[in-house]
Amino acid sequence: MMDEELDFLLGTMQWSFSRLNSYYNCAYEWFLHYVECNKSENGFFGEYGSLIHKILEKYEKGELSLFELNEYYEDHFDEDVPHDAPPNKFVNIRQSYYDKGIDYLDNIDLDLEKYEILGVEKKVEFKINDKDFVGYI
């Protein structure tokens, strides 16, 4: 890819936290994914986050009670999070996340009657130094 093409691509790209974080973690992987447009499969962290989001959404919609969250988590963890976490010589990240998920859902204090939900994953678009950004809140 020529420098001019890369400058054009970067100048017209819509940026997000995940794009910036991807670059921060591995510039080459970011290049392959966002510049070369190589498909990458979802990894452990994305799958884990999607499972937690799905559980909380089911609770908000009334499909799961507060007392059913952990059971759903345990029943769906291996199916919804099939990829292994990256290796770490100090801790088994997969097991650590699994345990923290159980602890989180066991101790969650989420009384929806106390809150007015204004939106879920509401898209927000803005500019920083003439660069387009998108985020979800």
Residue ranges and their predicted role:
Residues 1-6:
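Accessory/regulatory regions of helicases
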Residues 17-64, 98, 121-122:
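Nuclease catalytic cores
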Residues 31, 117-119, 136:
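Short hydrophobic-acidic sequence motifs that mark active-site Asp/Glu residues
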Residues 51-128:
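A non-catalytic, helix-rich entry segment at domain boundaries
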Residues 125-137:
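Nucleic-acid nuclease catalytic cores
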